[in-house]
């Protein structure tokens, strides 16, 4: 799909801060490179280009990064490789496991920054929810990450590195089957690194994951949405409001690209890709959860082949929003189904370790050390006890 400079889908120009820029005569991070990048780099060093496929296979298929173990490389090349390439990965600062099987990883970006990624299990898949930025510029009101201003966009090696570190910590027999760019940050605010990462993830010489198993989620950066169809991956859109008034209230991006522009881009995506769009809709008590909102939502998206994921709000310290009660959630779900919508009520996974949708942040969480024995909290659901304990800890840290 090519961008038309006169359409709403024309691309935005970004300064390329996503490519590794090593000091002169310093090795390049291997995970910053696609196969074609590595071929060109090796050629520039006077080496045979076919060595790139060999190295990719060693690293991504065999998980070997020690040049001395890459036995089909010449001795001379193995000796030269450490001066050409580094295989550094972002260290794992914290690895938490939920009672429901969800796992959360906190990564050190080595510059004082950190990001999180989440592994979500289900019957037939194991999904990695991956981050694309430290913080986020979108400032969605209900999102914990949105409270943090964008600190920096992740580079390709930062994103690929999340996958590699998670993969190497999975239980025997487990493997990542799906990847969703739904972690910290707005993927289409960092398109160069995100779509370069997708090239590595999809490459048969790389991670070798089908493009149909990769989903890019956006809050609605309309001029960049053409890239998702161009990459032949799936599109998810954070809608979260049944009309412009409510969506603008909870998602400031709607003031720049309203629902009309957003849905036109969605229709264009379907025209090119023939893939249904997934609309994500967070239920906020008293704001987006009424039956009239359900009716408005169905009317809003009626011309876009789609499915709707309903996500009951996951509370976090200082959010100012509440999760609707179960009866309200079920009534909203039923109303959508009665109106003929293809709808899924998403189960919130990992709430006890603050790994659910909208709860990711850049600091170590406290669930391992939270004191929830206080009798005042004892009668509450576990996730609510931990939320209140986290809020108290946050307040104590501010004093």
Curated annotation (Swiss-Prot):
Cofactors, names only: [4Fe-4S] cluster
UniProt KW Methyltransferase keyword: yes
Reactions that this protein is recorded to catalyse: adenosine(2503) in 23S rRNA + 2 reduced [2Fe-2S]-[ferredoxin] + 2 S-adenosyl-L-methionine = 2-methyladenosine(2503) in 23S rRNA + 5'-deoxyadenosine + L-methionine + 2 oxidized [2Fe-2S]-[ferredoxin] + S-adenosyl-L-homocysteine; adenosine(37) in tRNA + 2 reduced [2Fe-2S]-[ferredoxin] + 2 S-adenosyl-L-methionine = 2-methyladenosine(37) in tRNA + 5'-deoxyadenosine + L-methionine + 2 oxidized [2Fe-2S]-[ferredoxin] + S-adenosyl-L-homocysteine
EC number: 2.1.1.192
CDD domains cross-referenced by the UniProt entry: Radical_SAM
Residue numbers binding [4Fe-4S] cluster: 136, 140, 143
Main location: cytoplasm
Coiled-coil annotated residue ranges, if any: none
Pfam families: Radical_SAM, RlmN_N
GO molecular function, one term: tRNA (adenine(37)-C2)-methyltransferase activity
Record field: transmembrane: none
Keyword annotations: 4Fe-4S, Cytoplasm, Disulfide bond, Iron, Iron-sulfur, Metal-binding, Methyltransferase, rRNA processing, S-adenosyl-L-methionine, Transferase, tRNA processing
UniProt keyword Ribosomal protein, yes or no: no
Family per record: Belongs to the radical SAM superfamily. RlmN family.
Function: Specifically methylates position 2 of adenine 2503 in 23S rRNA and position 2 of adenine 37 in tRNAs. m2A2503 modification seems to play a crucial role in the proofreading step occurring at the peptidyl transferase center and thus would serve to optimize ribosomal fidelity.
The protein, known as: Dual-specificity RNA methyltransferase RlmN
UniProt organism field: Bdellovibrio bacteriovorus (strain ATCC 15356 / DSM 50701 / NCIMB 9529 / HD100)
Gene (UniProt): rlmN
